[in-house]
Amino acid sequence: MTKDMETIVSLAKHRGFVFPGSDIYGGLSNTWDYGPLGVELKNNVKKAWWQKFITQSPYNVGIDAAILMNPKTWEASGHLGNFNDPMIDNKDSKIRYRADKIIEDYMLNEKGDENFVADGLSFDEMKRIIDEEGIVCPVSGTANWTDIRQFNLMFKTFQGVTEDSTNEIFLRPETAQGIFVNYKNVQRTMRKKLPFGIGQIGKSFRNEITPGNFIFRTREFEQMELEFFCKPGEEIEWQNYWKTFASQWLKDLNLSEEATRLRDHDADELSHYSNATTDIEYRFPFGWGELWGIASRTDFDLKKHSEHSGEDFQYHDQETGEKYIPYCIEPSLGADRVTLAFLCDAYDEEGVEGSKDSRTVLHFHPALAPYKAAVLPLSKKLSGDAIKVFEELSADFAIDFDESQSIGKRYRRQDEIGTPYCITFDFDSLEDEKVTVRDRDTMEQVRMPITELKSFLAEKVKF
């Protein structure tokens, strides 16, 4: 089926996945609050990442670094000088745009070229394309543009009681730098030898010029980042390892392989710190978008922090006697983006066999589903006994309890929020201590002893 972004966003709002931020005050541009189901979904995504990339990895450990860091961090990393977007203003509408994004949108919508990438073009090259193609502002309809200028993406604030330059600090634009400055602390305390990785999940902030597409591009977002340190010369081998590992993680969680692709960055597209980068992209209803950037950052970060701080980041290889600054592979995944990808991928509208009705269903992998099961008493008279099943299961799983409306409507409601299994407690359950378990995807029903429910669900949520 052809999926429509507006329909998916409507479902997300209607069913409590995502709400507009500050809604009662008219909202705040491009801010979103995760509702009861959305926070469960996103937490499950983060849990799945941590499980495979940290807990079950023989190489990696985790940290949780502070959002606010010494401003010298951002001088060393290059963010204060180089973390910019190309900005262009329409003189008639007074609206500011990212020059690369209005070019890419034009190429997609007017030329049908979904593979065009403007990132890496010079300001002059972008302005020439805008002028030659006659790209207009979507609001004013005119091509009356300013020159392209740099726009720093970091949010600035102040620490302490006075607002002057000596108290300037920044909300971090990425979680990576918190890992790099803690490299020696982790390596020493955990007695790690190369290769090894440090991962974390946390909020980052970028003052994007043109955020949009729901939760895909926002100014406040969450990252799941791994910095994997290795011997120089082995970085491409390890980059390939993490490309395969990341792709398999998505596949294991049932993200459509047909809707994902790996795209290598061209030489002129590479970031200043990278000698190789591959993006894992997903085909959203609005087009292809990056989920995961898997970059070889070389020794850029540790070397820069060593130069600015005076700290020696050399690694002493006891096997060879060599000393060197490790190279780093960074698989960086957007938690909000991949959550949106799982939501879009799971969305389906399908006919019901033997009926004129259709149903909306979210085919989440059980490990990601907000609720693993819903306990449904066939009658409110059975609620007192059915709640005991809920209490037993909810000690280990996220379980819904729903006693309102007909059983058919309750099935449809659970399908629409992605609950894999509905457990119906009926009058026979009082006698045989069994329940009817309905599968979300097949709609098949089986009779099962209540005592087997825990082991059944535990097996199903594995991935």
UniProtKB/Swiss-Prot annotation:
* Gene name tied to this protein: glyQS
Q: Which Pfam families match?
A: HGTP_anticodon (PF03129), tRNA-synt_2b (PF00587)
The record's listing under CDD domains reads: GlyRS-like_core, GlyRS_anticodon
Q: What is this protein called?
A: Glycine--tRNA ligase
Q: Which positions, given as ranges, span the membrane?
A: none
Positions binding ATP in this chain are: 206-208, 216-221, 290-291, 334-337
Complexes and interactors? Homodimer.
Family matches, as PROSITE patterns: AA_TRNA_LIGASE_II
Sorted alphabetically, the Gene Ontology BP terms of this entry are: glycyl-tRNA aminoacylation
UniProt catalytic activity: tRNA(Gly) + glycine + ATP = glycyl-tRNA(Gly) + AMP + diphosphate
